Amino acid sequence: MAAARPGGVSPGGETSRGTAGPPRKVSPGGETPRGANVIGVLALQGDFEAHTKILQTLGAQPREVRVPADLAGLDGLIIPGGESTVITLGIEREGLGDPLRELAGSGTPVLGTCAGMIVLDRDHLGVLDIRVQRNAFGRQLRSFEADLELVGVDGGPVHAIFIRAPWVVEHGAGVEVLAQVQAHPVAVRQGNVFAVAFHPELAGETRLHKLLLDTLARRTADAGSRGPC
């Protein structure tokens, strides 16, 4: 299912780069495009800036999320790769745990990448009914790249960069496995929540972000078709 290519991976994964600075909203030209979907990117640590750039190219309005107030009015959320322990401690420090659970529970589309998959699992936020193994493929020197066929993603294989990546060791019946490597799930979906063990943003891969936006569009269309009570 995956054609792996060792090497050629820039430092990242559970990384220390992209440490959060002062809160700011991101938009081209400093203005929110009219009618654009507002997608939050958790910006406590990690490679959140790469996600904001991809969202901008897709016409969405990214917002860096550091405190609960930043979650207000979001149409979707991305939890990026980085150091899962640092991100988890930041969530606890800023009081983001319950607000993040409520956001996911409301049906808002959520995507977690690499460390984001860990943050979403049973042992952390508990948003996804999965249990993961950290650094499952080995440490930094065992990082690799692979082309994966993902269920629900058209246009050929997704180029995936695995850096100190996790894999899923256990999941509930309500979790759909979208891709595997070495017979272990590395991409999953449970309702409105997606998680992948790799870094699409480091490869310039936009289809996972499009999947998030497409899920949002279907949710909006379904709500509109029901009309007022």
Task: Name the predicted role of every residue range.
Residues 83-149:
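Cysteine-nucleophile active-site neighborhood
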Residues 123-184:
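Pocket-forming structural segment of enzyme catalytic cores
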Residues 44, 115, 198:
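Cofactor-binding loop segments of dinucleotide-utilizing enzymes, especially the Rossmann-like FAD-
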Residues 61-63, 110, 193:
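Hydrophobic anchor at the start of a short beta-strand
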Residues 1-93, 102, 206-210, 214-229:
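N-terminal beta1-alpha1 cap of cysteine-dependent amidohydrolase-like domains
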Residues 78-80, 111, 162, 195-197:
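Structural motif
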Residues 2-3, 167-229:
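C-terminal and late-domain segments of enzyme folds
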